Design a protein with these regions (language model features):
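N-terminal leader/linker segments that precede catalytic domains of diphosphate-processing enzymes
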Residues: 1-158
Length: 158
């Protein structure tokens, strides 16, 4: 098997051979990535918006939601998000999916949590990393796209 990365020099460790007598190149040549079941990785973006000059209170706070246009959960409201590409960092996935589904781009988002219940998606095992941003409502314009039927700001009632 060819190594997943072209440059794996930072993974040499001390340069020792393992118990099977393999150096890193030999180990990677024989490694089978199908040996273990692997989950899919997704990201979701929790984007809050506030009215006015600053976010001094949670009164009037809104969250950005998209209406799913495909299965699973077709017609349900969800956070914007989706699957990571194989050679894409999760930060990039969060930005790409947010833009594809809502037209929103250029936000600075913070990684806030990871969700991994094994039965959270009927398609396959999915681990989701959530990102968050808080923005003035008038700073972003939302437009549904990709697999989102609609994209709207919804009031948060706590």
């Amino acid at each position: 098997m060819t190594a997943f990365l072209n440059d794996f020099s930072k993974f040499y460790g001390t340069g020792e051979k393992n118990e099977a007598g393999q150096n890193l190149e030999e180990f990677l040549e024989l490694y089978d990535p199908r040996k273990y079941e692997t989950p899919s990785n997704t990201t979701d973006a929790v984007i809050f918006a506030y009215e006015g000059e600053s976010c001094d209170s949670i009164d009037g706070l809104k969250v950005l939601l998209v209406k799913r246009s495909n299965h699973p959960s077709i017609g349900y409201w969800a956070l914007p998000g989706g699957f990571a590409n194989m050679r894409e960092d999760l930060d990039e996935t969060a930005r790409r999916e947010l833009e594809e589904e809502t037209g929103v781009k250029g936000l600075v988002m913070e990684q806030i949590a990871t969700y991994g219940d094994y039965d959270r998606d009927p398609r396959t095992r999915v681990i989701t990393t959530a990102y968050m941003a808080v923005v003035p409502e008038n700073a972003v314009k939302v437009q549904a796209g990709d697999d989102a039927a609609d994209a709207v700001w919804c009031e948060v009632n706590l």
